[in-house]
Amino acid sequence: MSQVKLKPKKKYGHIDGCVRCGRKRGIVRRYGLHLCRQCFRETARQLGFEKYS
């Protein structure tokens, strides 16, 4: 018999923490970013966000 490889189960819903540093509080989930607010401030320019005021 041939070996059947199972794929890991895909996780749906909220991500546990920031994908960059792992922090659990202050998560920015809008547009699928999943960054904490501190990491968002550090990387916003590279992501294409501009500050107008």
From Swiss-Prot:
Record GO terms (molecular function): rRNA binding; structural constituent of ribosome; zinc ion binding
Cofactor note: Binds 1 zinc ion per subunit.
SUPFAM superfamilies in the record: Glucocorticoid receptor-like (DNA-binding domain)
An annotated GO cellular component: cytosolic small ribosomal subunit
BP GO terms, sorted: cytoplasmic translation
Keywords: Metal-binding, Ribonucleoprotein, Ribosomal protein, RNA-binding, rRNA-binding, Zinc
Binding-site list for Zn(2+): C18, C21, C36, C39
Pfam families xref list: Ribosomal_S14 (PF00253)
Requisite cofactors: Zn(2+)
InterPro entries: Ribosomal_uS14 (IPR001209), Ribosomal_uS14_arc (IPR023676), Ribosomal_uS14_CS (IPR018271), RIbosomal_uS14_euk_arc (IPR039744), Ribosomal_uS14_sf (IPR043140)
Function recorded in the entry: Binds 16S rRNA, required for the assembly of 30S particles.
Homology family: Belongs to the universal ribosomal protein uS14 family. Zinc-binding uS14 subfamily.
Subunit details: Part of the 30S ribosomal subunit.
HAMAP family: Ribosomal_uS14_2_A (MF_01364_A)
Protein's UniProt name: Small ribosomal subunit protein uS14
Organism: Thermoplasma acidophilum (strain ATCC 25905 / DSM 1728 / JCM 9062 / NBRC 15155 / AMRC-C165)
Origin organism lineage: Archaea, Methanobacteriati, Thermoplasmatota, Thermoplasmata, Thermoplasmatales
